[in-house]
Amino acid sequence: MDDDRKKALGAALGQIEKQFGKGAVMRMGDARAVRGDVKSISTGSLALDVALGIGGLPRGRVVEIYGPESSGKTTLTLHIIAEAQKAGGAAAFVDAEHALDPDYAEAVGVDINDLLVSQPDTGEQALEIADMLVRSGGLDVVVVDSVAALTPKAEIEGEMGDSHVGLQARLMSQALRKLTGSIQRSNTLVVFINQIRMKIGVMFGSPETTTGGNALKFYSSVRMDIRRLGAIKKGDEVLGNETRVKVVKNKMAPPFKQAEFEILYGEGISREGEIIDMGVAQGFVDKSGAWYSYNGDRIGQGKDNARQFLRNNPQIAADIEARIREKVLGTALPEAEPTEDAASDTEQKSGKGS
């Protein structure tokens, strides 16, 4: 580029910076240096973290989780919240369905005393609350459950049989246009849970679609389709569900990968079961007949006994998981970045100690 053009560009950049602030325009290499690598928050499922390619869900992005009823959508989001809290982060749950069970959330591992919960009356109120929470910059995860329950105010105030074509789609489109910038700036992971509906008269292809129009499909960096495969039984007693998640869209890594795991009633995702399955697949756990062994020591006969052994010995479970992550992802367990409040607390403590 010649000197005159460089001067003209420099003057334009200076004017933009003066009017819109520092960092309004920057060279892509500088932007990458400022933002660094995309941080992730674990999903609570080792297999799903691997399928996502970056060890979890990306911070500063929109994620959609959809599937049929009782497929494990809310359970998965509660695990995401629990993982963020374990790493010192904070989370909020916008419960538009008014169906969140605090006892189950606690059983899954969520610190309910540290979880912000909102049960809004209208879709506009729900999305406005989500926007304000994201803009605060103090949260790591915001979950909206669910898009289908975000009822526009006009529909709530109208008569039961009134037609309100496209209201919800317009609401979602407007909200996502407003939210996207603040989500990226605050580095908050925003998860939308969605339901499935059937399109009428579809001859070819899948008749399934998600609610709320197409905006969420476009704005989401990751979309996950979660399905119940079958029941986990011990004799006649049903203990939980076998679940499959397909990553149908992924802007962070190659898409269309799948993960299978067990969701146990009253407990959530069976992490020990995943560690055993993936440990065997990666060669860290030996399986001979019904016996499972690790480092030459037998850890149980049958998967249930091996799972119980890992529950009783969390350090061994953590060691196997760390080795699996190191081999498959080349990383350790992902951590959520501390919030601004947590960072200031740490600085104050270090100041007192010095």
Curated annotation (Swiss-Prot):
Keywords: ATP-binding, Cytoplasm, DNA damage, DNA recombination, DNA repair, DNA-binding, Nucleotide-binding, SOS response. It comes from Halorhodospira halophila (strain DSM 244 / SL1) (Ectothiorhodospira halophila (strain DSM 244 / SL1)). It is found in: Cytoplasm. ATP binds at residues 67-74. Can catalyze the hydrolysis of ATP in the presence of single-stranded DNA, the ATP-dependent uptake of single-stranded DNA by duplex DNA, and the ATP-dependent hybridization of homologous single-stranded DNAs. It interacts with LexA causing its activation and leading to its autocatalytic cleavage. InterPro entries: AAA+_ATPase, DNA_recomb/repair_RecA, DNA_recomb/repair_RecA_CS, P-loop_NTPase, RecA-like_C, RecA-like_N, RecA_ATP-bd, RecA_C_sf. It comes from the Bacteria. GO terms for molecular function: ATP binding; ATP hydrolysis activity; ATP-dependent DNA damage sensor activity; damaged DNA binding; single-stranded DNA binding. Coiled coil: none annotated. Its main location: cytoplasm. GO terms for cellular component: cytosol. One of its GO terms (biological process) is DNA recombination. Residues 329-354 are annotated as: Disordered. This is Protein RecA. Pfam families: RecA (PF00154), RecA_C (PF21096). The gene is recA. Belongs to the RecA family. Transmembrane segments: none annotated. PROSITE patterns: RECA_1 (PS00321), RECA_2 (PS50162), RECA_3 (PS50163).
